[in-house]
Swiss-Prot record:
Residues 478-646 form the tr-type G domain. Residues 588-591 are annotated as: G4. One of the essential components for the initiation of protein synthesis. Protects formylmethionyl-tRNA from spontaneous hydrolysis and promotes its binding to the 30S ribosomal subunits. Also involved in the hydrolysis of GTP during the formation of the 70S ribosomal complex. It comes from Porphyromonas gingivalis (strain ATCC BAA-308 / W83). Residues 68-386 are annotated as: Disordered. GO terms for molecular function: GTP binding; GTPase activity; translation initiation factor activity. This is Translation initiation factor IF-2. Residues 487-494 are annotated as: G1. The lineage of its organism: Bacteria, Pseudomonadati, Bacteroidota, Bacteroidia, Bacteroidales. Residues 102-179, 217-229, 260-273, 347-356 have a biased composition (Basic and acidic residues).
Length: 979
């Protein structure tokens, strides 16, 4: 195969210099600046293998097939051009000169043999030559087929010989009568281009057929017999023949020069034979090239037959590539119609795929196509990214990021679900909740899943940022138990702790009730230590009790013997059991005359909490905290529970624990009470708690004495945090302050996002609901308190006061004294400032007086709630009721100019006042409602007229009064509404 380097470079889309340089590296002698250098098979294969890697899939194979086809026609094309220029007549010597290239020499000798045998007897010569060609080298095979092709062409006349022997005999016998005469003239032109174009001006095709077919034809003639019998279908060969149009197109310009008349006569005489030729081509499916060449020759010779159609198909494609003469195209158009009928669906699909592949490769082969492809890929990538973002966004919309202890209303807002449905779901799982009650993590998960949401707790997400430390078993030592005292308000929790600690904590609590979580360390006479947590009993402190149960080891549930098991007691028991905390029941106040401990045990048994006295597993002790009865026995039972639990911790590691309370101390800054649960907390440690962080500057115990370190189960008060962490947050000791700051900032960001999610924008539905209610009002509050737990409890209680007509909004809550910024916020939002055990600063008080902002300060949570209730009642619009005071009958009417209609009436019942409102009724229908214009008794004005007397009156803004009308007098009474 001899190919121009430039042609291959154009197909591979590579510079000629690059190809030449590559060949020189491989040891071939190639000129760098000569694009017309011809390369052989070996060089072609190397180049296609090297530079075909970057081509699209299937492109390299297409290029290989293209040049394999061209190799059959290109050598012939060169001589054909010479023939045209020099003349067809007597330039055999010149054509012979072209044979000089070494590649062509073997063909030349073989062709010479063909010529000598041709003029003599065409029929016997193929028989002799076929074995010779088979014995000869592959190049020799190329020459032999030329004659065989001429014989194969007449095979189309085989119709009369449809019997089994038709395959060998028709091919050889039929050419004898017609073709020997025709073949002789054909052979003469072949002799002129002896080198390779043996055949008439069409020489290119014969040569194309010459290269591969001889060996294949030999096989054909042997195999075709069987193939023809087995394969009668005409579809497959046609499709393949169509693919090999390239060869015939080269010779399209020389068609008129060849002896087409003889071929036409054959076609006219034997139309059926042509169809059989199609079958032959199909039988030659194995030898694609030969079939294409044969059909190509016939197509050029024939003007409009069945053979022509197959040849024309071969001509159509090359005609487009090499710009053939218009005559060839016309023939192609004519002949392209019949084959369409025979093409199968598979062929059509394959053709479409090839066409699309060719189009796409053309695009990529140009720089413009590359740019378009790049832009298309970029668009696809952008669309995929947008689709992924939409999927991710839809997932995020169904994922709730929240913290534990979210209220029912906040949860409903985040899910955009009516509050009633959330409450109904909670009731279905056995929980009686209110709109502002806080839910724990487990309940939130259940409710969210019910509505198709996933929950992601912010706290859990951020705890993962801190790698947990694993403790070795040998490093663990026993630690004191953490005991929480829980129960109903005024049942004696703090009194019990006082008795244990020999102090008087109650005197320090406003109103004698506990409003903070107190943490106290206690050393018993036996030397063992216990850490006590005292939780508030008031219903507002639900979250506080939940936190107390979360960090405790043992719970003492205290119940007054002279009272019942109260709601807060039940709630405390539920918190403890939910946390899996063992409980010890202390029945207090047994010194009182009305004490009945057995009734308490019975009520506990009804709740499925059987005490040991009644055969259950829960320990109980009857005590009197005030008089110190049985306190020691209670502590022994607590220590027994602790021994069963085998509480251990590792003091030789960084500390981890929980925030119990946090507050703002004017002299010391933000102060936090923490419970160390594991490890040891030292002075100077970097602490991260919630969104707050800092380095510990000082530590104090519960008696306000400075300490330098705190071990497991030890409560301490720490200074140094940059804010007041939320009660219940976990604190961790980190290595660097930078790490703590980064995590704290991330937590703060998530907390802010949750606040935005919870904030619900007013919708049209809300507006219409408010208009339906009529006088809808909002009460905005700013809550400031001394400790975080109290602020949270108070805020929840105030929000719970909301009604349909008045909505209470806590727009800001914080720890610390009331500052100027609080006053500015209150002025901007028309809010009232509530201070719980805090006072405003001097500047804030002056600012409040200037701006007209009301500041209320309280020390007891009950007082705060009652005051806000009364304020809300004052905001309610009063209820208006009508009270009928009397009725009159119109006896006679008089019309007076400038005054209007005067009615003379008799008071039937009650009395009519000058200030009363009246209603004019005619035939039972109210005609007018308004006020009296005047009321007279004779000629004097009267303030009121009682029953049985006559009077004269006129109605303001109405003169439509008739005899017999009834006038009803009534008063409107405003009745104050209550919550």
């Amino acid at each position: 195969m001899s190919i121009k380097l430039f042609s291959l470079a154009k197909e591979l889309n590579v510079g000629v210099g690059s190809l030449a340089g590559f060949l020189r590296k491989k040891g071939f002698d190639v000129e760098d600046n000569n694009p017309n250098v011809r390369i052989e098979n070996e060089e072609f294969d190397l180049l296609l293998t090297e530079f075909g890697k970057s081509l699209p899939k299937g492109e390299a194979e297409r290029i290989r097939k293209k040049f394999v086809k061209q190799k059959q026609g290109t050598p012939a094309s060169a001589p054909s051009a010479k023939e045209e220029t020099a003349g067809m007549a007597a330039k055999e010597a010149q054509v012979i000169a072209t044979e000089v290239p070494q590649d062509m020499r073997p063909r030349f000798t073989i062709k010479g043999k063909v010529e000598t045998e041709k003029p003599a007897e065409p029929v016997p010569s193929p028989k002799d030559k076929e074995p010779d060609t088979v014995r000869e080298d592959k190049p020799a095979r190329e020459t032999a087929p030329v004659k065989e092709e001429t014989k194969v062409v007449p095979v189309k006349e085989d119709k009369p010989k449809e019997e089994k022997p038709k395959q060998e005999e028709p091919k050889r016998e039929e050419p004898k009568p017609e073709e020997p005469v025709q073949a002789a003239p054909v052979a003469k032109p072949v002799e002129k281009p002896v080198d390779k174009p043996q055949q008439p001006v069409m020489t290119q095709k014969p040569q194309e057929a010459e290269t591969p077919p001889p060996a294949q034809e030999m096989e054909k003639k042997e195999d075709t017999e069987e193939v023809f019998r087995l394969k009668t279908n005409t579809q497959e060969p046609q499709v393949k023949v169509v693919g090999k149009i390239d060869l015939s197109s080269i010779n399209s310009s020389t068609r008129p020069k060849k002896k087409t008349k003889e071929d036409r006569q054959r076609e006219q005489n034997d139309a059926d034979g042509k169809k059989k030729r199609k079958r032959i081509n199909k039988a030659a499916v194995d030898v694609k090239k030969e079939a294409a060449k044969v059909s190509g020759e016939q197509g050029k010779r024939n003007a409009g037959g069945g053979n022509h159609s197959s040849g024309n198909k071969n001509n159509n494609r090359p005609a487009q590539q090499q710009s053939n003469a218009s005559g060839g195209r016309k023939n192609n158009k004519r002949q392209s119609l019949p084959p369409k009928v025979e093409i199968s669906d598979e062929d059509v699909q394959r053709q479409v795929k090839e066409t699309l592949a060719r189009l796409t490769t053309k695009k990529t082969s140009t720089t413009l196509g590359r740019g378009a492809k790049y832009r298309k890929d970029k668009r696809d990538a952008a669309s995929r990214a947008a689709q992924d973002a939409m999927e991710l966004n839809s997932e995020e919309q169904h994922t709730l990021k929240l913290t534990e202890f979210v209220t029912v209303s906040d949860l409903s807002n985040m899910m955009d679900v009516p509050v009633n449905e959330v409450i109904a779901t909670c009731m279905s799982i056995g929980m009686m909740v209110g709109i502002n009650q806080r839910l724990d993590a487990e309940t939130i998960n259940i409710v969210a899943e019910e509505f198709g949401f996933k929950t992601e707790f912010v706290s859990a997400d951020l705890v993962e940022a801190i790698a947990p430390e694993e403790d070795n078993e040998e490093d663990l030592v026993a630690r004191p138990p953490i005991v929480t005292v829980m129960g109903h308000v005024d049942h004696g929790k703090t009194s019990l702790l006082d008795r244990i600690r020999n102090t008087n904590v109650i005197e320090g609590e406003a109103g004698g009730i506990t409003q903070h979580i107190g943490a106290y360390g206690l050393k018993l006479p036996s030397g063992r230590r216990i850490t006590f947590l005292d939780t508030p009993g008031h219903e507002a402190f639900t979250a506080m009790r939940a936190r107390g149960a979360k960090i405790t080891d043992i719970a003492i549930i205290i119940v007054a013997a002279d009272d019942d098991v109260m709601p807060q007691t039940v709630e405390a028991i539920n918190h403890a059991s939910a946390a899996g905390v063992p409980m010890v029941f202390a029945i207090n106040k047994i010194d009182k005359p009305a004490a009945n401990p057995e009734r308490i045990k019975e009520q506990l048994a009804n709740m499925n909490y059987l005490v040991e006295d009644w055969g259950g597993k829960y320990q109980s002790q009857e005590i009197s905290a005030k008089k110190g009865i049985n306190i020691t026995e209670l502590l022994e039972k607590v220590l027994l529970e602790a021994d069963i639990l085998e509480l251990k911790a590792n003091p030789n590691r960084r500390a981890i624990g929980s925030i119990i309370e946090s507050s703002l101390d004017k002299g010391r800054g933000y102060v936090s009470t923490v419970m160390v649960q594991n490890g040891t907390l030292n002075m100077g440690d970097v602490v991260l708690a919630g969104t707050c962080h800092g380095r510990i500057k000082a530590m104090f115990n519960e008696r306000n004495q400075r300490v330098k370190q705190a071990g497991p189960s030890e409560p301490v008060l720490i200074l140094g945090l940059n804010g007041a962490p939320a009660a219940g947050d976990t604190f961790n000791v980190l290595e660097t302050e930078q790490e703590a700051r980064e995590i704290a900032n991330r937590r703060e960001q998530l907390q802010r996002e949750q606040g935005l999610r919870t904030h619900k924008i007013l919708t049209l539905e809300d507006i219409s609901r408010r208009r339906a209610i009529g006088n809808f009002q909002e009460l905005n509050l700013i809550v400031k308190g001394d400790v975080d737990g109290s602020v949270e409890a108070l805020s929840d209680s105030l929000i719970r006061l909301s009604t349909e007509e008045i909505q209470v909004n806590v727009i800001h809550k914080a720890v610390g004294q009331i500052s100027e910024s609080d006053v500015v916020l209150a002025a901007a939002s028309s809010a009232i400032i509530i201070g719980f055990q805090v006072r405003p600063s001097v500047a804030a008080r002056k600012q409040a007086e200037t701006d007209g902002v009301e500041i209320r300060t309280y020390s007891i949570i009950y007082d705060t709630i009652e005051d806000i209730k009364s304020a809300m009642e004052g905001m309610l619009s009063p209820e208006i009721r009508e009270e009928v005071t009397g009725s009159l009958e119109v006896l006679q009417t008089f019309k007076i100019s400038k005054v209007g209609t005067i009615a003379g009436c008799m008071v039937k019942e009650g009395k009519v006042k000058r200030t009363s409102k009246v209603r004019l009724i005619r035939d039972g229908i109210v005609i007018h409602t308004g006020e009296l214009g005047s009321l007279k008794r004779f000629k004097d004005d009267a303030k009121e007229v009682v029953a049985g007397l006559e009077c004269g009156l006129n109605l303001a803004h109405s003169n439509d009064i008739q005899d017999g009308d009834i006038i009803e007098a009534f008063d409107e009474i405003e009745i104050k509404k209550t919550l």
